[in-house]
From Swiss-Prot:
Cellular component GO terms, alphabetical: cytosol
The gene coding this protein: rfbA
Record function comment: Catalyzes the formation of dTDP-glucose, from dTTP and glucose 1-phosphate, as well as its pyrophosphorolysis.
Cofactor comment text: Binds 1 Mg(2+) ion per subunit.
Natural source organism: Escherichia coli (strain K12)
Needed cofactors: Mg(2+)
EC number: 2.7.7.24
Protein name as it appears in the record: Glucose-1-phosphate thymidylyltransferase 1
Lineage: Bacteria, Pseudomonadati, Pseudomonadota, Gammaproteobacteria, Enterobacterales
Disulphide bridges: none
Keywords, alphabetical: Lipopolysaccharide biosynthesis, Magnesium, Metal-binding, Nucleotidyltransferase, Transferase
Additional information: Both catalyzed reactions, i.e. dTDP-glucose biosynthesis and pyrophosphorolysis, follow a sequential ordered bi-bi catalytic mechanism.
Domain of life the protein comes from: Bacteria
Amino acid sequence: MKMRKGIILAGGSGTRLYPVTMAVSKQLLPIYDKPMIYYPLSTLMLAGIRDILIISTPQDTPRFQQLLGDGSQWGLNLQYKVQPSPDGLAQAFIIGEEFIGGDDCALVLGDNIFYGHDLPKLMEAAVNKESGATVFAYHVNDPERYGVVEFDKNGTAISLEEKPLEPKSNYAVTGLYFYDNDVVQMAKNLKPSARGELEITDINRIYLEQGRLSVAMMGRGYAWLDTGTHQSLIEASNFIATIEERQGLKVSCPEEIAFRKGFIDVEQVRKLAVPLIKNNYGQYLYKMTKDSN
């Protein structure tokens, strides 16, 4: 099986969240008890991906480096690249060409939160796919805000549209994508859309036309949260808080995922818990080390 690398696109100007994001990246804002970027990072980790590129703006990249470092504390290899201006999601593959090399890759948007017991299993099928692309569809009330996938009566994807005025279904394409290495050349060959961007929907449409696009359904039991508005930030925080307080288990905790997947050992978890020990997060990590003995 080929190696698969991960990209987190954490750029953009976050204008819909002004004035909150006038001085700080949206992806550094808190979602309950952790920075937003921990959630997409955890998604890639749950897929078993350890080589990850974070793409952000010139002003925000140093802040992500300060927060996340080189990733070695979690058994990861984190690298960074700058996106000078937000010219479309597909630009991530051009910026990340050297990082991707000859490998397959996954892209997750830095403001997307995924939750579900079977999420690792769902992603495993995408990771193990030898060629082509996999995207994930989720039923929404407001499909006109997203890329929309249309299915025939057999459940086969037949069309993709970006933010259509009259959506052909209620299934939105989420901000998590798995591609083979062909995606790099496809991105380089793309023409900007009417709004001047290199559209991820155009990449997905090429794979669809070639008969190489798989659409995996995130059905009942999954949550996909898009945190682009003030209201959705509150809703996402409340969602995470409700689950964590009810179960006593953390959602998207990189330290825990790294430990459970064998990226780091119990001693490293203990070391990571020390500077956080005055709050619930650090105490949770410390308790985890005691329980594992």
